[in-house]
Curated annotation (Swiss-Prot):
One of its GO terms (cellular component) is plasma membrane. It is found in: Cell inner membrane. The keyword Translocase applies. Belongs to the NqrDE/RnfAE family. Its main location: membrane. It comes from the Bacteria. It is a multi-pass membrane protein. This is Na(+)-translocating NADH-quinone reductase subunit D. NQR complex catalyzes the reduction of ubiquinone-1 to ubiquinol by two successive reactions, coupled with the transport of Na(+) ions from the cytoplasm to the periplasm. NqrA to NqrE are probably involved in the second step, the conversion of ubisemiquinone to ubiquinol. GO terms for biological process: sodium ion transport.
Amino acid sequence: MSSAQNVKKSILAPVLDNNPIALQVLGVCSALAVTTKLETAFVMTLAVTFVTALSNFSVSLIRNHIPNSVRIIVQMAIIASLVIVVDQVLKAYLYDISKQLSVFVGLIITNCIVMGRAEAFAMKSAPVPSLIDGIGNGLGYGFVLITVGFFRELFGSGKLFGLEVLPLVSNGGWYQPNGLMLLAPSAFFLIGFLIWVIRILKPEQVEAKE
Protein backbone atom coordinates (compact mmCIF):
# COMPACT_ATOMS: atom_id res chain seq x y z
CA MET A 1 0.00 0.00 0.00
CA SER A 2 1.43 3.42 -1.01
CA SER A 3 1.99 6.23 1.48
CA ALA A 4 -0.86 8.23 -0.10
CA GLN A 5 -3.22 5.29 0.42
CA ASN A 6 -2.03 4.93 4.02
CA VAL A 7 -2.75 8.61 4.66
CA LYS A 8 -6.20 8.31 3.06
CA LYS A 9 -7.01 5.22 5.13
CA SER A 10 -5.79 6.82 8.38
CA ILE A 11 -7.98 9.88 7.81
CA LEU A 12 -11.12 8.21 6.39
CA ALA A 13 -11.26 4.95 8.39
CA PRO A 14 -12.24 6.64 11.69
CA VAL A 15 -15.21 8.34 10.00
CA LEU A 16 -17.28 5.20 9.27
CA ASP A 17 -15.14 2.06 9.50
CA ASN A 18 -13.73 2.65 12.99
CA ASN A 19 -15.56 5.68 14.33
CA PRO A 20 -14.47 6.53 17.89
CA ILE A 21 -18.05 7.28 18.97
CA ALA A 22 -20.17 5.01 16.76
CA LEU A 23 -18.00 1.88 16.96
CA GLN A 24 -15.76 2.32 20.01
CA VAL A 25 -18.38 4.32 21.99
CA LEU A 26 -15.82 6.83 23.29
CA GLY A 27 -16.32 10.55 23.94
CA VAL A 28 -20.10 10.25 24.25
CA CYS A 29 -20.51 12.70 27.16
CA SER A 30 -19.28 15.74 25.25
CA ALA A 31 -21.26 14.60 22.19
CA LEU A 32 -24.44 14.86 24.27
CA ALA A 33 -23.56 18.28 25.67
CA VAL A 34 -22.17 20.38 22.82
CA THR A 35 -24.46 19.43 19.91
CA THR A 36 -27.42 21.75 20.54
CA LYS A 37 -25.97 24.02 17.85
CA LEU A 38 -23.91 23.32 14.74
CA GLU A 39 -21.62 26.20 15.67
CA THR A 40 -20.54 24.66 18.97
CA ALA A 41 -20.31 21.18 17.43
CA PHE A 42 -18.02 22.52 14.69
CA VAL A 43 -15.75 24.41 17.09
CA MET A 44 -15.54 21.39 19.41
CA THR A 45 -14.59 19.26 16.38
CA LEU A 46 -11.74 21.64 15.54
CA ALA A 47 -10.60 21.73 19.18
CA VAL A 48 -10.54 17.94 19.61
CA THR A 49 -8.88 17.42 16.21
CA PHE A 50 -6.17 19.96 17.06
CA VAL A 51 -5.49 18.45 20.48
CA THR A 52 -5.58 14.83 19.28
CA ALA A 53 -3.30 15.48 16.31
CA LEU A 54 -0.67 17.51 18.16
CA SER A 55 -0.72 15.37 21.30
CA ASN A 56 -0.21 12.26 19.14
CA PHE A 57 2.66 13.98 17.33
CA SER A 58 4.30 15.20 20.55
CA VAL A 59 3.95 11.88 22.38
CA SER A 60 5.37 10.03 19.39
CA LEU A 61 8.38 12.36 19.21
CA ILE A 62 9.44 11.54 22.77
CA ARG A 63 7.99 8.03 23.09
CA ASN A 64 11.41 6.37 23.36
CA HIS A 65 12.40 8.67 26.24
CA ILE A 66 9.27 8.26 28.39
CA PRO A 67 9.67 5.85 31.34
CA ASN A 68 6.89 3.31 31.23
CA SER A 69 5.90 4.02 34.84
CA VAL A 70 5.02 7.68 34.13
CA ARG A 71 3.86 7.50 30.51
CA ILE A 72 0.20 8.31 31.33
CA ILE A 73 1.26 11.35 33.39
CA VAL A 74 3.45 12.61 30.53
CA GLN A 75 0.64 12.09 28.02
CA MET A 76 -1.83 13.98 30.21
CA ALA A 77 0.64 16.85 30.72
CA ILE A 78 1.04 17.22 26.94
CA ILE A 79 -2.72 17.00 26.34
CA ALA A 80 -3.47 19.47 29.16
CA SER A 81 -0.99 21.99 27.74
CA LEU A 82 -2.65 21.84 24.32
CA VAL A 83 -6.13 22.13 25.85
CA ILE A 84 -5.06 25.26 27.75
CA VAL A 85 -3.88 26.78 24.45
CA VAL A 86 -7.22 25.95 22.79
CA ASP A 87 -9.20 27.30 25.75
CA GLN A 88 -7.29 30.60 25.78
CA VAL A 89 -7.64 31.05 22.00
CA LEU A 90 -11.40 30.46 22.22
CA LYS A 91 -11.73 32.94 25.09
CA ALA A 92 -9.72 35.52 23.14
CA TYR A 93 -11.38 35.19 19.73
CA LEU A 94 -14.67 33.28 20.18
CA TYR A 95 -15.75 34.28 23.66
CA ASP A 96 -19.48 33.57 23.22
CA ILE A 97 -18.81 30.07 21.92
CA SER A 98 -16.28 29.53 24.69
CA LYS A 99 -19.02 30.30 27.25
CA GLN A 100 -21.42 27.91 25.51
CA LEU A 101 -18.86 25.10 25.49
CA SER A 102 -18.22 25.83 29.17
CA VAL A 103 -16.26 23.10 30.97
CA PHE A 104 -16.32 20.71 28.02
CA VAL A 105 -13.23 22.28 26.45
CA GLY A 106 -11.30 21.58 29.65
CA LEU A 107 -12.67 18.05 29.74
CA ILE A 108 -10.90 17.30 26.45
CA ILE A 109 -7.98 16.51 28.77
CA THR A 110 -9.77 13.37 29.93
CA ASN A 111 -11.47 12.57 26.61
CA CYS A 112 -11.08 8.84 26.00
CA ILE A 113 -10.42 9.40 22.30
CA VAL A 114 -7.45 11.71 22.90
CA MET A 115 -5.97 9.56 25.67
CA GLY A 116 -6.68 6.35 23.78
CA ARG A 117 -4.91 7.38 20.58
CA ALA A 118 -1.88 8.68 22.49
CA GLU A 119 -1.55 5.39 24.37
CA ALA A 120 -2.59 2.90 21.68
CA PHE A 121 -1.08 4.52 18.58
CA ALA A 122 1.35 7.37 19.26
CA MET A 123 3.40 5.37 21.79
CA LYS A 124 4.06 2.74 19.11
CA SER A 125 4.27 4.78 15.89
CA ALA A 126 6.35 7.43 14.15
CA PRO A 127 5.43 11.14 14.51
CA VAL A 128 3.88 11.77 11.07
CA PRO A 129 1.59 8.70 11.05
CA SER A 130 0.61 9.63 14.63
CA LEU A 131 -0.26 13.16 13.52
CA ILE A 132 -2.40 11.80 10.67
CA ASP A 133 -4.07 9.30 13.00
CA GLY A 134 -4.97 12.14 15.35
CA ILE A 135 -6.49 14.15 12.51
CA GLY A 136 -8.50 11.14 11.34
CA ASN A 137 -9.89 10.36 14.78
CA GLY A 138 -10.72 14.02 15.37
CA LEU A 139 -12.65 14.07 12.10
CA GLY A 140 -14.41 10.82 13.02
CA TYR A 141 -15.47 12.38 16.32
CA GLY A 142 -16.54 15.52 14.47
CA PHE A 143 -18.60 13.56 11.94
CA VAL A 144 -20.89 12.37 14.73
CA LEU A 145 -20.97 15.76 16.48
CA ILE A 146 -21.83 17.69 13.33
CA THR A 147 -24.42 15.14 12.18
CA VAL A 148 -26.17 15.19 15.57
CA GLY A 149 -25.80 18.97 15.87
CA PHE A 150 -27.37 19.44 12.43
CA PHE A 151 -30.58 17.62 13.35
CA ARG A 152 -30.78 19.02 16.90
CA GLU A 153 -30.45 22.64 15.81
CA LEU A 154 -32.63 22.24 12.72
CA PHE A 155 -35.57 20.60 14.49
CA GLY A 156 -34.94 22.11 17.92
CA SER A 157 -34.86 25.75 16.84
CA GLY A 158 -35.52 25.74 13.09
CA LYS A 159 -32.07 27.20 12.48
CA LEU A 160 -28.61 26.21 11.23
CA PHE A 161 -25.54 28.14 12.38
CA GLY A 162 -28.02 30.53 14.03
CA LEU A 163 -29.75 31.37 10.74
CA GLU A 164 -33.47 30.62 10.33
CA VAL A 165 -33.97 27.74 7.88
CA LEU A 166 -37.50 26.58 8.71
CA PRO A 167 -40.07 29.44 8.86
CA LEU A 168 -40.92 29.75 12.55
CA VAL A 169 -44.45 30.17 13.88
CA SER A 170 -43.20 33.08 15.99
CA ASN A 171 -42.26 34.88 12.77
CA GLY A 172 -45.46 34.01 10.89
CA GLY A 173 -44.16 30.72 9.47
CA TRP A 174 -45.34 27.12 9.84
CA TYR A 175 -42.67 25.41 11.94
CA GLN A 176 -43.02 25.04 15.70
CA PRO A 177 -39.57 24.24 17.20
CA ASN A 178 -39.35 20.94 19.06
CA GLY A 179 -37.82 21.80 22.43
CA LEU A 180 -37.11 18.14 23.16
CA MET A 181 -34.38 18.19 20.50
CA LEU A 182 -32.43 20.66 22.61
CA LEU A 183 -32.33 18.31 25.61
CA ALA A 184 -29.44 15.89 26.14
CA PRO A 185 -31.59 12.71 25.81
CA SER A 186 -32.37 13.62 22.20
CA ALA A 187 -28.64 13.52 21.39
CA PHE A 188 -28.42 10.11 23.05
CA PHE A 189 -31.18 8.74 20.81
CA LEU A 190 -29.77 10.42 17.69
CA ILE A 191 -26.34 8.87 18.33
CA GLY A 192 -28.03 5.50 18.79
CA PHE A 193 -29.92 5.96 15.53
CA LEU A 194 -26.70 6.96 13.75
CA ILE A 195 -24.93 3.85 15.09
CA TRP A 196 -27.85 1.74 13.81
CA VAL A 197 -27.61 3.31 10.33
CA ILE A 198 -23.82 2.83 10.19
CA ARG A 199 -24.17 -0.83 11.18
CA ILE A 200 -26.77 -1.38 8.48
CA LEU A 201 -24.29 0.07 5.97
CA LYS A 202 -21.38 -1.77 7.61
CA PRO A 203 -22.78 -5.15 8.79
CA GLU A 204 -19.28 -6.34 9.71
CA GLN A 205 -19.45 -3.94 12.69
CA VAL A 206 -22.36 -5.82 14.25
CA GLU A 207 -21.20 -7.80 17.29
CA ALA A 208 -21.44 -11.57 16.96
CA LYS A 209 -24.10 -13.26 19.07
CA GLU A 210 -22.75 -15.06 22.12
